[in-house]
Regions:
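A conserved beta-strand element that flanks and buttresses the S-adenosyl-L-methionine
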Residues: 103
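Hydrophobic adenine-recognition pocket in adenosine-nucleotide-binding enzymes
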Residues: 107
Length: 194
Protein backbone atom coordinates (compact mmCIF):
# COMPACT_ATOMS: atom_id res chain seq x y z
CA UNK A 1 0.00 0.00 0.00
CA UNK A 2 1.34 3.44 -0.88
CA UNK A 3 1.45 5.08 2.52
CA UNK A 4 2.44 8.50 1.16
CA UNK A 5 -1.09 8.75 -0.25
CA UNK A 6 -2.44 9.10 3.28
CA UNK A 7 -0.69 12.36 4.06
CA UNK A 8 -1.77 15.59 5.71
CA UNK A 9 -3.76 16.63 2.60
CA UNK A 10 -5.67 13.35 2.59
CA UNK A 11 -6.57 13.69 6.28
CA UNK A 12 -7.56 17.33 5.84
CA UNK A 13 -9.81 16.37 2.91
CA UNK A 14 -11.59 13.40 4.50
CA UNK A 15 -11.32 14.13 8.24
CA UNK A 16 -11.23 17.94 8.32
CA UNK A 17 -14.15 20.33 8.73
CA UNK A 18 -16.65 18.02 7.03
CA UNK A 19 -15.43 14.50 7.83
CA UNK A 20 -16.74 11.38 6.13
CA UNK A 21 -17.62 10.13 9.62
CA UNK A 22 -17.71 12.39 12.66
CA UNK A 23 -16.44 11.53 16.13
CA UNK A 24 -20.05 11.67 17.36
CA UNK A 25 -21.19 9.11 14.76
CA UNK A 26 -18.36 6.76 15.65
CA UNK A 27 -19.12 7.21 19.37
CA UNK A 28 -22.61 5.79 18.75
CA UNK A 29 -21.23 2.93 16.67
CA UNK A 30 -18.57 2.05 19.26
CA UNK A 31 -21.14 2.12 22.07
CA UNK A 32 -23.53 -0.11 20.11
CA UNK A 33 -20.75 -2.57 19.25
CA UNK A 34 -19.57 -2.73 22.87
CA UNK A 35 -23.10 -3.33 24.12
CA UNK A 36 -23.84 -6.02 21.53
CA UNK A 37 -20.74 -7.97 22.54
CA UNK A 38 -21.87 -7.64 26.17
CA UNK A 39 -25.39 -8.78 25.21
CA UNK A 40 -23.93 -11.96 23.71
CA UNK A 41 -22.01 -12.60 26.94
CA UNK A 42 -18.65 -11.36 25.71
CA UNK A 43 -16.20 -9.16 27.53
CA UNK A 44 -13.95 -6.61 25.86
CA UNK A 45 -10.67 -6.29 27.72
CA UNK A 46 -8.57 -5.50 24.66
CA UNK A 47 -9.23 -3.63 21.42
CA UNK A 48 -7.22 -3.24 18.22
CA UNK A 49 -8.07 -0.44 15.78
CA UNK A 50 -6.58 -1.15 12.34
CA UNK A 51 -6.22 1.73 9.91
CA UNK A 52 -7.23 4.00 12.75
CA UNK A 53 -7.00 7.30 10.89
CA UNK A 54 -7.99 9.93 13.48
CA UNK A 55 -8.46 7.13 16.04
CA UNK A 56 -12.12 7.71 16.93
CA UNK A 57 -12.68 4.13 18.19
CA UNK A 58 -9.51 4.14 20.28
CA UNK A 59 -10.36 7.52 21.75
CA UNK A 60 -13.87 6.31 22.66
CA UNK A 61 -12.51 3.21 24.40
CA UNK A 62 -9.88 5.18 26.30
CA UNK A 63 -12.53 7.64 27.46
CA UNK A 64 -15.45 5.28 28.16
CA UNK A 65 -13.61 2.09 29.15
CA UNK A 66 -10.16 3.12 30.40
CA UNK A 67 -9.35 -0.40 31.64
CA UNK A 68 -9.55 -1.82 28.12
CA UNK A 69 -6.08 -2.33 26.60
CA UNK A 70 -6.12 -0.37 23.33
CA UNK A 71 -3.74 -0.54 20.37
CA UNK A 72 -4.27 1.66 17.33
CA UNK A 73 -2.37 1.18 14.07
CA UNK A 74 -2.17 2.85 10.69
CA UNK A 75 -0.01 2.72 7.54
CA UNK A 76 0.12 6.51 7.38
CA UNK A 77 3.20 8.07 8.94
CA UNK A 78 1.21 11.30 9.21
CA UNK A 79 -1.61 9.61 11.16
CA UNK A 80 0.85 7.81 13.42
CA UNK A 81 2.68 11.02 14.29
CA UNK A 82 -0.44 13.10 14.71
CA UNK A 83 -2.66 10.61 16.56
CA UNK A 84 -0.12 8.36 18.29
CA UNK A 85 -0.74 5.09 16.42
CA UNK A 86 1.81 2.37 15.77
CA UNK A 87 2.97 2.18 12.15
CA UNK A 88 1.63 -1.17 10.87
CA UNK A 89 0.27 -2.58 7.60
CA UNK A 90 -2.35 -5.26 8.33
CA UNK A 91 -1.56 -6.95 5.01
CA UNK A 92 1.97 -7.62 6.29
CA UNK A 93 1.59 -7.61 10.08
CA UNK A 94 -0.10 -10.16 12.31
CA UNK A 95 -0.37 -9.28 16.01
CA UNK A 96 1.39 -11.68 18.37
CA UNK A 97 -1.77 -12.07 20.47
CA UNK A 98 -5.48 -11.80 19.73
CA UNK A 99 -7.75 -8.95 20.81
CA UNK A 100 -11.30 -9.23 22.13
CA UNK A 101 -12.45 -6.62 19.62
CA UNK A 102 -10.78 -5.74 16.34
CA UNK A 103 -11.99 -2.74 14.35
CA UNK A 104 -11.15 -2.35 10.67
CA UNK A 105 -13.23 0.38 9.12
CA UNK A 106 -12.78 1.68 5.57
CA UNK A 107 -9.31 0.21 5.07
CA UNK A 108 -9.35 -2.83 2.82
CA UNK A 109 -10.73 -1.06 -0.24
CA UNK A 110 -7.27 0.54 -0.55
CA UNK A 111 -5.61 -2.87 -0.97
CA UNK A 112 -5.42 -4.98 -4.10
CA UNK A 113 -7.03 -8.43 -3.94
CA UNK A 114 -3.93 -10.32 -2.80
CA UNK A 115 -3.09 -7.81 -0.07
CA UNK A 116 -6.75 -7.68 1.02
CA UNK A 117 -6.82 -11.48 1.36
CA UNK A 118 -3.66 -11.40 3.50
CA UNK A 119 -5.18 -8.61 5.58
CA UNK A 120 -8.38 -10.61 6.14
CA UNK A 121 -6.34 -13.62 7.30
CA UNK A 122 -4.42 -11.37 9.69
CA UNK A 123 -7.62 -9.77 10.97
CA UNK A 124 -9.07 -13.22 11.62
CA UNK A 125 -5.96 -14.30 13.53
CA UNK A 126 -6.03 -11.02 15.49
CA UNK A 127 -9.65 -11.45 16.61
CA UNK A 128 -10.48 -13.41 19.76
CA UNK A 129 -14.17 -12.48 20.02
CA UNK A 130 -15.60 -9.91 17.61
CA UNK A 131 -14.58 -7.98 14.51
CA UNK A 132 -16.21 -4.74 13.43
CA UNK A 133 -15.55 -4.61 9.69
CA UNK A 134 -16.59 -2.24 6.96
CA UNK A 135 -15.15 -1.53 3.52
CA UNK A 136 -16.41 0.43 0.55
CA UNK A 137 -17.93 -2.02 -1.93
CA UNK A 138 -18.82 -1.64 -5.59
CA UNK A 139 -22.51 -1.50 -4.60
CA UNK A 140 -21.84 1.23 -2.02
CA UNK A 141 -19.87 3.29 -4.53
CA UNK A 142 -22.83 3.23 -6.92
CA UNK A 143 -25.78 3.41 -4.53
CA UNK A 144 -25.11 4.39 -0.90
CA UNK A 145 -22.26 6.87 -0.44
CA UNK A 146 -22.02 10.56 -1.14
CA UNK A 147 -19.69 10.40 -4.12
CA UNK A 148 -18.53 13.99 -3.59
CA UNK A 149 -17.17 13.28 -0.11
CA UNK A 150 -16.04 9.65 -0.47
CA UNK A 151 -12.60 8.58 -1.66
CA UNK A 152 -13.49 6.45 -4.67
CA UNK A 153 -9.87 5.88 -5.68
CA UNK A 154 -10.08 2.32 -4.40
CA UNK A 155 -10.19 -1.37 -5.29
CA UNK A 156 -13.95 -1.87 -5.32
CA UNK A 157 -15.12 -5.43 -4.70
CA UNK A 158 -18.52 -6.94 -4.01
CA UNK A 159 -19.84 -7.54 -0.54
CA UNK A 160 -19.97 -11.24 -1.38
CA UNK A 161 -16.19 -11.19 -2.01
CA UNK A 162 -15.62 -10.03 1.58
CA UNK A 163 -18.31 -12.30 3.05
CA UNK A 164 -16.87 -15.43 1.41
CA UNK A 165 -13.52 -14.82 3.09
CA UNK A 166 -14.81 -13.62 6.46
CA UNK A 167 -17.26 -16.53 6.81
CA UNK A 168 -14.32 -18.94 7.05
CA UNK A 169 -13.65 -17.74 10.60
CA UNK A 170 -16.68 -15.68 11.58
CA UNK A 171 -20.45 -15.66 11.87
CA UNK A 172 -21.95 -12.49 10.43
CA UNK A 173 -24.12 -10.85 13.06
CA UNK A 174 -25.06 -7.81 10.98
CA UNK A 175 -24.36 -4.09 11.14
CA UNK A 176 -20.67 -4.73 10.49
CA UNK A 177 -20.26 -7.17 13.38
CA UNK A 178 -18.58 -10.53 12.84
CA UNK A 179 -18.37 -12.99 15.75
CA UNK A 180 -15.39 -15.35 15.75
CA UNK A 181 -16.60 -18.94 15.41
CA UNK A 182 -14.10 -20.06 18.05
CA UNK A 183 -15.15 -17.34 20.55
CA UNK A 184 -17.73 -19.42 22.40
CA UNK A 185 -20.37 -16.69 22.01
CA UNK A 186 -23.79 -18.03 21.13
CA UNK A 187 -25.97 -16.12 18.70
CA UNK A 188 -29.58 -17.08 18.19
CA UNK A 189 -30.54 -18.01 14.65
CA UNK A 190 -32.26 -14.69 13.95
CA UNK A 191 -29.32 -12.70 15.34
CA UNK A 192 -27.24 -14.04 12.47
CA UNK A 193 -27.58 -12.68 8.97
CA UNK A 194 -27.49 -16.20 7.46
Amino acid sequence: MKTSRFDERYFSRYYGKQPVRSMNEVDHLAAATHEMVSWWGGSIRSMLEVGAGPGHWSRWYRRMHPRVRVLSTDVSEHACKRYGHELRDIAEWRPSRPYDLVVCMDVLQYLDDRAAERALRNLTAATRTCLYFDALTSFDAKHTVDRSSTDLNAHLRSGSWYRARLERGFVQAGAGLWVRKSSGLVLHELERTR
